[in-house]
Amino acid sequence: MFIKNKTISNYDADVYRMMKQEYQRQENHIELIASENYVSSCVMEAQGSQLTNKYAEGYPGKRYYGGCDYVDAIEKIAIKRAKKLFNANYANVQPHSGSQANYAVYSALLKPNDIVLGMSLSHGGHLTHGSSVNFSGKLYKFISYGLDISGDIDYPQIRKLAHRYKPKMIVGGFSAYSGICNWKLLREIADEINSYLFVDMAHISGLVAAGLYPNPLKYAHVVTSTTHKTLSGPRGGLILAKGDNVSLFKKLNSSVFPGCQGGPLMHVIAAKAIAFKEAMEPEFKDYQYQVIKNAQEMAKTFISRGYKVVSGKTFNHLLLLDLSNKNITGKRADILLHSANIIVNKNSIPNDLLSPFITSGIRIGTPAITRRGFTELESRQVSNWICDILDNFNNIEISAKVKQKVLNLCSLFPVYK
């Protein structure tokens, strides 16, 4: 039996203290990790609701447990909104994460050891696009494509590899690429070899929803996404498709449940439904537009300060800084910036000579800072502070001054206070 009015603060002081410290960290640090964002209070409320108690294996109307009337209704709302938001004919809102959504797609359409063509992790792909340490690289034979010398996706290489290896699937999408993907050309290449085109739009789904980045659903057989990142919802996954291929839809559903998951997280699905509604508001497009403008302002500032931006530009929410000519590793840059309350992540650059644990670059994203109200002005300031620290990485005094500026700026743009 539990005490109904018990709170974390008066029951578990250790966990409560860490929760409060994390709250303060988010308020007092500038968050530039491209995959992180701040959810709304409505999304948080749904995730802390009584829906967390309900087990609901199966799909609406076909559950393995009773008492699912209301969670059925919630999941139907989430599905309807996801389809409307992305102009899809099919949506599965049950995946617990983007990685599980990707796993479900692979297992639905491929057999073990099938050949797959995906973007190299070191060139901007994701672990689930064929990394040898990930299930994708262990279960399937991945061939990797990358970027050309200008930093753009190398489509001639993709076509050459596709015709040489005849992959069962071509994977589009990325985790560290600042350009615009040519989904139409990828589909043309896939059709030339009778292959599936699967797109992972986890990083850019918010931009796609706002109509500011090409929608891959027009060309891909299947699309997955996370529901956080630019979409600004809870941490979770999503599978989408267009057309009327009922057989494909059934395969995808079966691959999620019972294929790789049991009971869905109904409190998270409710939060997804809310996030989808938020993404249909006019303000959401304004937000996404500012996300891009802030990223472009940061790229311009870094270039003006003598830093190399991979691809030389950005058309989305992120950019990759190449530090190979700055006598500093991505790992050290990450640590130095962290000491000044600026949060980035070390990231490999194309043809990186350093290990993924060290790297020659850092990845920077603008969804979170834009969510708290930063515009081009603040983005430019932050970029200059980053340069000040990295240009003087042995100067503790400069780092301390930047940290104070960060604290002052954060106080002007609170997240939840």
Swiss-Prot record:
SUPFAM superfamilies: PLP-dependent transferases. GO terms for molecular function: glycine hydroxymethyltransferase activity; pyridoxal phosphate binding. Gene3D superfamilies: Aspartate Aminotransferase, domain 1 (3.90.1150.10), Type I PLP-dependent aspartate aminotransferase-like (Major domain) (3.40.640.10). Coiled coil: none annotated. Pathway: One-carbon metabolism; tetrahydrofolate interconversion; Amino-acid biosynthesis; glycine biosynthesis; glycine from L-serine: step 1/1. Pfam families: SHMT. GO terms for biological process: glycine biosynthetic process from serine; tetrahydrofolate interconversion. It is an enzyme of class 2 (transferase). It is found in: Cytoplasm. Keywords: Amino-acid biosynthesis, Cytoplasm, One-carbon metabolism, Pyridoxal phosphate, Transferase. Its EC number is 2.1.2.1. One of its GO terms (cellular component) is cytosol. Belongs to the SHMT family. Catalyzes the reversible interconversion of serine and glycine with tetrahydrofolate (THF) serving as the one-carbon carrier. This reaction serves as the major source of one-carbon groups required for the biosynthesis of purines, thymidylate, methionine, and other important biomolecules. Also exhibits THF-independent aldolase activity toward beta-hydroxyamino acids, producing glycine and aldehydes, via a retro-aldol mechanism. Homodimer. This is Serine hydroxymethyltransferase. The lineage of its organism: Bacteria, Pseudomonadati, Pseudomonadota, Gammaproteobacteria, Enterobacterales.
